[in-house]
From Swiss-Prot:
2S seed storage protein having sweetness-inducing activity. This form is not heat stable. The keyword Phosphoprotein does not apply. Belongs to the 2S seed storage albumins family. Heterodimer of a small A and a large B chain linked by disulfide bonds. Gene3D superfamilies: Plant lipid-transfer and hydrophobic proteins. InterPro entries: Bifun_inhib/LTP/seed_sf, Bifunc_inhib/LTP/seed_store, Napin/2SS/CON. Keywords: Disulfide bond, Seed storage protein, Storage protein, Taste-modifying protein. This is Sweet protein mabinlin-1. GO terms for molecular function: nutrient reservoir activity. The keyword Disulfide bond applies.
Amino acid sequence: EPLCRRQFQQHQHLRACQRYIRRRAQRGGLVDEQRGPALRLCCNQLRQVNKPCVCPVLRQAAHQQLYQGQIEGPRQVRQLFRAARNLPNICKIPAVGRCQFTRW
């Protein structure tokens, strides 16, 4: 998906989304971030991505967080990917809904 990879780079690697899903993973999925600035920025970035690329770029964002090594243990990894899959829903991106990707 070279097009989606390019979009990922154009939108600063969805840095705000990475921050949001990392916090969700580290805090055990607590919902206190639901209205935070990271989420607002993330949703704005996500809305600029072509619809077919929304899930692929979120998957890339999750992988980038894994490679940075701040996510510890299988539970945090699960939470990380769950948070990433849910973002289109949380950001209310029409016609995308929840992403289907798994860890790999």
